[in-house]
Every structure is written in C-alpha cells, then in structure tokens.
Amino acid sequence: MLLCVRLRSYHLRRKHNGNCAQSITLEISEFWTRGGVNLDISSRCTLACPNCARQSIADIPANLLSEAEFDTYLKHFDRFIFCGQISDPILHPKLDVFLSKIYAAGKMCSVHVAATHKPDAFYTKCFKAHPKSNWYFGIDGLPKDSHKYRVRQDGEKLFRLMLESRKYIAKSIWQYIIFKYNENDVDTAKALCIEHGLEMSLIKSNRWAKDDPLKPTSTDNYYIREQHE
C-alpha cells in the first residue's frame, strides 16, 4: 500500500505543539507499516501552473527534507515516489543523494519532474544516482507548447533532458496532460515516443474551473469531477 505524505500535514506535525500535533500523530499511527511512500521533499517550485494546488494555498511554509529525516523513511519503506503535490523534487539540492541511498539499499524509486530551472548537469547527476529508477517528465503538449500550462517551463529543454535520461535510467516516461491547446497533438507526441524509445503517460484531467479556457474541446479528452452535496 502506498501512502502519500503531503507537505502541509508534515509541517503541522513539526511546527505545532499540544492537541494539534497529537491529533495528527494519531491520524498517521500506521504510517510506518506502509510498503511505499510519496514524498513532497521541499516546498519549492519555479513553475506557476494555473490549476496546481500551490495557487490556492496562501502560505506555503518553507521546508527542505533533511538527509537525517530521509534516512528514517529509508529504514521503513521499500518503494519511493518523488511526486510533489506542491513542489518539484528536482529543486531539492540533495535529490541525487536520496536517490543514491535508495539504490544502494536495493529499493525502487520513481521521480516526477516538470521544473527546468536547474543546470543540465544536476539532472544528469540525479539520473545516474539510481540506474533502475523511472522518471516522469511533465511536458504537456509538444515541447514548444508545454509552457502554455506549465508557466515558466522550458519544454524544449525538458524534452532534451528526457532524451538524455534514456542513457542512465530504467524508464523515461513522457507525462502529457491533455488541454485544449494540445489535444490535437497527441498522435504526434505518440509518434515521437516511438521514434525515441520513450513511454507515454497520457492524462485526462478533471481539474476544470467554470469556463476554463484550457479545458479540451472533445469530451473524450477530459473527466468531469463529480459534485457531492
């Protein structure tokens, strides 16, 4: 079973005393019995994706998961996912260290990235740190268009890094969320995956605001979120 650790809950446990901390501790009493964990390892992201949870959280507390804290997780879990709910794992300065430790322990890992504001050399260092890892690259549309949702992203740089990653890791996966601006480019993206030996993860979203200009035209390309009373 996989447990996702959200940064906000994590900070509540660390920051507050008394009843608040106690109640959260009780909620995660079975935390260490899980087989896998999804970690938000920092509070950092350089992108400004409109439908991201970051846009609705007024105060995101600054935090970096320390190496000592990570070592605690490493003792208890066999599978790690670095898929930030409000952060991008590539922006943690010790991501390569975490990956190296997971690999040395013979454990599995996947990494989800979309930010492009680190030097190429750091990405390569992280790729090399865990040769059996799987990486998901968030490029929503053709590389030249991905910034239309992934605001401030250099999609062409990330595509190039995705191709480079094939030399070092187990799987390089193109994660493609369907939007109005890219719904007609899916077949082209699939052809690029075949050409370059990539896997594709095609995602239909349900995070749509009323009259959302990013919402695909075709009803086959999105989900409708159920409304509950």
Where do the PLM segments sit?
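Conserved alpha-helical substructure of the radical SAM core
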Residues: 3-6, 10-134, 145-156, 160, ...
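A glycine-centered beta->alpha junction motif in the catalytic cores
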Residues: 139-143
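Conserved strand-turn element in the central/C-terminal portion of the radical SAM core barrel
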Residues: 162-185, 205-207
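PLP-dependent aminotransferase class I/II
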Residues: 174, 190-195, 225
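Flexible glycine/acidic-rich beta-alpha junction loops that bind and position SAM and/or redox cofactors
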Residues: 181, 201-222
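Aromatic-anchored helix/helix-loop segment that forms the rim or "lid"
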Residues: 221-229
